[in-house]
């Protein structure tokens, strides 16, 4: 049978482990090698301490306490406190908007009775009555007038032991401190044209941003830090704030070392990453109420942006890893809403974005070290998707969100439509965020993560800003480009090739002749005959077989067989120590993994549907272990795979491992299996449907889950190539004998070929539907 190819891959998985072990032993051998390091030895051999090298930071850190500055006249910035620090009594500060506000602050020493003093305010001698009854604290008096020729009136006062005062322009008002330290507070009064109000300070002062107002209040009430009260702190002119510093640019090329032929250049670059997710939404056959798969797919995106006045053309490829499989089963009826599998990314998942642009930094990305990157986080939120049912209200999957956090960067090779490019692969870890996702009109709600159904939420792209730095070994002559090659750190990304190959494979389903397929399904396909249609296969048959087995041993099928083998081994050892096979939950637990469910069977249809669906997913393994003479689903899928490989124009040695592994997992996702007991047949499918019926009349009988599980343990499991609905339709329209019924139930290939040669439309339609399910 054609399914021999899958059996060979499963049976020979140990040879891959042995090959890896021999290879590791070879690596472990050591030799004494004398190395003569040249000027660029560190590029061939990793430095002792790997680090990012020089990464320039363009972030300006604003100090909390800026100053002290010398007395001056200037227009202070809005939302900044002027912290005034006078040494002697007298005029501290004056300011005006030259329209309707003239204000001044004077300082009075302790122990002053009411007296009239003369102050020069705005160039005019003013007589001001002042007093300070405190014996220890200095008194700041805030004065104000509204016309140039008017008289000053007292607005507020501040009794201060530290001898500090503050003033600020904010929100259309002029703010000052009042009250008494250490409990001084702020107060403000409306000032028109306040942002153009100029100040003249007659003492040293500091500048503090408003977002640090709590610190400013702390200074007003308790004094400046001790370091500010030493003679080592010298006030400077306010003009020093306008000094232009020659800072290193974020986007620059630094030559680290150079010889006649080669040089090391550090590239520091700003980067704007734009990416989008792609997905595949596949409906099952039938009446239109069921979806077989909603999954993430790699997505390419090309765009332009400006970096330091230069227009950059960039290309990204987004892919995901570590997806979580969810499903929803609304029931066993043909009109029940079902999603067999939909993918969700969450905390245990990763998102990969390959980035390349046409700048100088990517011209020689071959010999690279000290690669590092700093990227912002980005929130990805899911949108709505309507499941368009033929009749009734449509369920809607809505919501879901994840935050992407930069988790690393490495080299990779990115494939565009025309050329492969050495690029950077950014890895992002995920955290689940609000909102949760749900499916309306179902019980699926309050689940966290980002489902694949509408991950872009109708956006064109997601965007991440950041920067990266790398040191590259490049030719000293800038006109010469390093020969394109892939270093050992570069991972070959085949997703683009595989995507095109999948499209071609799925289109070839229409070109397969059913009669030839049955004949091919009966042939014992081995690895050599499977690969015989691929160009250059014979020259690399050994390495290809090894690569296929390496990939195949990581498949879900191989993992399930491995788990099943361990379970059976444990069950066998337990039986030898127990008098009853039921004491280890019987062999059913090893085959079906539902022994706990069988002990408490509910009579509801949904419960039976769930149990039979769980059992039927494991029946493929039982069928592989107990080969019968009938044809099975794997024979058909292997025959379709062989036919498509022979017809494909894009199949190659480097993508055949992915194709075979994916075919073993995804070909014919909707399968039904049956067991026969005398005249009774029990049939269950992976989508939860189940039937029990008589062979002669095809009359349905009650489905006994416990008996079905017992028969699965003791009887051969048969692929329902011609399922119950097709058999009943065939009998109602054409009439079949009891012997023909038994042969079709056993999936006898001889009888199948007879019906196909007779051009029976019901049987042909069933086989065609199976072929259409052979999709990548």
From Swiss-Prot:
Which cysteine residues pair off into disulfide bonds? 203-216, 318-380
Sorted keywords for this record are: Capsid protein, Coiled coil, Disulfide bond, Hemagglutinin, Host cell membrane, Host cytoplasm, Host cytoskeleton, Host endoplasmic reticulum, Host membrane, Host-virus interaction, Membrane, Outer capsid protein, Viral attachment to host cell, Viral penetration into host cytoplasm, Viral penetration via permeabilization of host membrane, Virion, Virus entry into host cell
Provide the coiled-coil residue spans: 484-511
For the site Cleavage, which positions are given? Answer: 231-232, 241-242, 247-248
Give a yes or no for keyword Transport in this entry: no
Question: Per its UniProt record, what SUPFAM superfamilies does this chain match?
Answer: Concanavalin A-like lectins/glucanases, VP4 membrane interaction domain
In its UniProt entry, what is this protein called? Outer capsid protein VP4
């Amino acid at each position: 049978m054609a399914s021999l190819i899958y059996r060979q891959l499963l049976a020979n998985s140990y040879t891959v482990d042995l090959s890896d072990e021999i290879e590791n032993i070879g690596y472990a051998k050591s030799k004494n090698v004398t190395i003569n390091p040249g000027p660029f030895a560190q590029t061939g051999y990793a430095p002792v301490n790997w680090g990012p090298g020089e990464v320039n930071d363009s972030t300006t850190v604003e100090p909390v306490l800026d100053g002290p500055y010398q007395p001056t006249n200037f227009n202070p910035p809005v939302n900044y406190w002027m912290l005034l620090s006078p040494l002697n009594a007298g005029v501290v500060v004056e300011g005006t908007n030259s329209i309707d506000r003239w204000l001044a602050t004077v300082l009075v020493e302790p122990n002053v009775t009411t007296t009239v003093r003369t102050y020069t305010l705005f160039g005019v001698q003013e007589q001001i009555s002042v007093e300070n009854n405190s014996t220890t604290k200095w008194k700041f008096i805030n004065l104000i007038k509204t016309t140039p020729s008017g008289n000053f009136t007292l607005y507020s006062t501040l009794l201060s032991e530290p001898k500090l005062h503050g003033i600020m322009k904010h929100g259309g008002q002029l703010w000052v401190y009042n009250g008494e330290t250490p409990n001084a507070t702020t107060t403000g009064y409306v000032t028109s044209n306040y942002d153009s109000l100029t100040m003249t300070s007659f003492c040293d002062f500091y500048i503090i941003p408003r977002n640090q107002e709590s610190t400013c209040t702390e200074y007003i009430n308790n004094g400046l830090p001790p370091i500010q009260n030493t003679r080592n702190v010298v006030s400077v002119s306010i003009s020093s704030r306008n000094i232009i510093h020659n800072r290193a640019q974020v986007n620059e090329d630094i030559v680290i070392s150079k010889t006649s032929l080669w040089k090391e250049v550090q590239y520091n670059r700003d980067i704007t990453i734009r990416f989008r997710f792609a997905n595949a939404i596949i409906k099952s056959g039938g009446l239109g109420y069921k979806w077989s798969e909603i999954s993430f797919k790699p997505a390419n995106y090309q765009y332009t942006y400006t970096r330091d006045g230069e227009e950059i053309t960039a290309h990204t490829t987004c892919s995901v890893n570590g997806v979580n499989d969810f499903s929803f089963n609304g029931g066993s009826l043909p009109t029940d809403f079902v999603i067999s599998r939909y993918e969700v990314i969450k905390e245990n998942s990763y998102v990969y974005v390959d980035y390349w642009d046409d700048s100088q930094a990517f011209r020689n990305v071959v010999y690279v070290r000290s690669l590092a990157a700093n990227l912002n986080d980005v929130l990805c939120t899911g949108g709505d998707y309507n499941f368009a049912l033929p009749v009734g209200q449509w369920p809607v999957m809505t919501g879901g969100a994840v935050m992407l956090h930069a988790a690393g960067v490495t080299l990779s090779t990115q494939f565009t439509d025309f050329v492969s490019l050495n690029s950077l692969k950014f890895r992002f870890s995920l955290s689940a965020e609000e909102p949760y996702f749900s499916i309306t009109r179902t019980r699926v709600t309050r689940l966290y993560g980002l489902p694949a159904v509408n991950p872009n939420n109708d956006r064109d792209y997601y965007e991440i800003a950041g920067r990266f730095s790398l040191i590259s070994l490049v030719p000293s002559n800038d006109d010469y480009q390093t020969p394109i090659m892939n270093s050992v750190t570069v991972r070959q990304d085949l997703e683009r090739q595989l995507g095109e190959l999948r499209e071609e494979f799925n289109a070839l389903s229409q070109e397969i002749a059913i009669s030839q397929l049955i004949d091919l399904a009966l042939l014992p396909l081995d690895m050599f005959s499977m690969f015989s249609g691929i160009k250059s296969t014979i020259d690399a048959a050994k390495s290809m077989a090894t690569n296929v087995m390496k990939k195949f041993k990581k498949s879900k099928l191989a993992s399930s067989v491995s788990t099943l083998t361990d379970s059976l081994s444990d069950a066998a050892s337990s039986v030898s120590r127990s008098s009853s096979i039921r004491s280890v939950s019987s062999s059913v637990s090893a085959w079906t993994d539902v022994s706990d469910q069988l002990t408490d069977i509910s009579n509801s249809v949904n419960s039976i549907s769930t149990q039979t669906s769980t059992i039927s997913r494991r029946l493929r393994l039982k069928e592989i272990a107990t080969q019968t003479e009938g044809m099975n689903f794997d024979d058909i899928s292997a025959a379709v795979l062989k036919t498509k490989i022979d017809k494909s124009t894009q199949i190659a040695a480097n993508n055949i491992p992915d194709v075979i592994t994916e075919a073993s997992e995804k070909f014919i996702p909707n399968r039904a299996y049956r067991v026969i007991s005398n005249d009774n047949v029990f049939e269950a499918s992976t989508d939860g449907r189940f039937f029990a019926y008589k062979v002669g009349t095809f009359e349905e009988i009650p489905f006994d889950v416990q008996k079905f599980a017992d028969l699965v343990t003791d009887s051969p499991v048969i692929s329902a190539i011609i399922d119950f609905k097709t058999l009943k339709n065939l009998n109602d329209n054409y009439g079949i004998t009891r012997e023909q019924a038994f042969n079709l139930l056993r999936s006898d290939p001889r009888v199948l070929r007879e019906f196909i040669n007779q051009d029976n439309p019901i049987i042909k339609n069933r086989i065609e539907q199976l072929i259409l399910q052979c999709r990548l």
